[in-house]
Curated annotation (Swiss-Prot):
Matching InterPro entries: NTF2-like_dom_sf, Rng_hydr_dOase-bsu
BP GO terms, sorted: phthalate metabolic process
Organism: Comamonas sp
Subunit-structure text: Heterotetramer composed of 2 alpha (TphA2I and TphA2II) and 2 beta (TphA3I and TphA3II) subunits. Part of a multicomponent enzyme system composed of a reductase (TphA1I or TphA1II) and a two-subunit oxygenase component (TphA2I or TphA2II and TphA3I or TphA3II).
Temperature-activity profile: Optimum temperature is 30 degrees Celsius. Approximately 60% of maximum TPADO activity is observed at 15 degrees Celsius, and activity is completely lost at 50 degrees Celsius.
Regulation: Inhibited by EDTA.
UniProt protein name: Terephthalate 1,2-dioxygenase, terminal oxygenase component subunit beta 2
Family listed: Belongs to the bacterial ring-hydroxylating dioxygenase beta subunit family.
Activity profile over pH: Optimum pH is 7. About 20% of maximum TPADO activity is observed at pH 9, whereas no activity is observed at pH 5.
Catalytic activity line of the entry: terephthalate + NADH + O2 + H(+) = (3S,4R)-3,4-dihydroxycyclohexa-1,5-diene-1,4-dicarboxylate + NAD(+)
C-alpha cells in the first residue's frame, strides 16, 4: 500500500527541488503522460478545466522550465513551500489519490517575503519501478486572485 509517509516524503522532495532552484529535476516527479494544473477553488468547484498553468505531459513541464531559464524575463525571486500532512482518499499497492494542503511564500530579491499562494494539492500517484510519480497534480489555490508573476511551479 502507498501510505501517507511515502507521500509526505515525496512532497518534501518535490518542494525542495523547487525551493532550491533545481528546476530541471521538477518534471521527473511526474509520469510521461501526466496532467499538471494550477487553478483556483472557484474554478475547480465549478468543474472548469482550464487553469492558470496547464500541462498534459512531462515534455510540457520540461518546456516550461526551458522557457523559464532561457526565454522569460521576470523579477528574480524564489519560493519556500510549507506543506501539511497528506490525506489518502483511495489507494492500493501501485496507485493512490491524495490531498495535501500547501502554502507557498515568495521571497523577492529585495528580501521582501509574502504569502504567494495557499491551497491544496489534489494528486493521483502511481509507482514506476517502485518509485512514486505523479500521474496528476491539480494545485487548487484558495484565492481567486493570482499574481501574474507565477513563473515557478507550485
Amino acid at each position: 500500500m502507498i501510505n501517507e509517509i511515502q507521500i509526505a516524503a515525496f512532497n518534501a522532495a518535490y518542494a525542495k527541488t523547487i525551493d532550491s532552484d533545481a528546476m530541471e529535476q521538477w518534471p521527473t516527479f511526474f509520469t510521461k503522460d501526466c496532467h499538471y494544473c494550477v487553478t483556483n477553488v472557484d474554478n475547480h468547484d465549478e468543474g472548469l478545466a482550464a487553469g492558470i498553468v496547464w500541462a498534459d505531459s512531462q515534455d510540457m513541464l520540461t518546456d516550461r522550465i526551458s522557457a523559464l531559464r532561457e526565454a522569460n524575463i521576470y523579477e528574480r525571486h524564489r519560493y519556500r513551500h510549507i506543506l501539511g500532512l497528506p490525506s489518502i482518499q483511495s489507494g492500493d499497492a501501485t496507485q493512490a489519490s491524495a490531498s495535501t494542503p500547501f502554502m507557498v511564500l515568495r521571497i523577492m530579491h529585495t528580501g521582501e517575503t509574502e504569502v504567494f499562494a495557499s491551497g491544496e494539492y489534489l494528486d493521483k500517484f502511481t509507482t514506476i519501478d517502485g518509485k512514486l510519480r505523479l500521474q496528476e497534480r491539480i494545485a487548487v489555490c484558495d484565492s481567486t486572485v493570482t499574481d501574474t508573476l507565477m513563473a515557478l511551479p507550485l
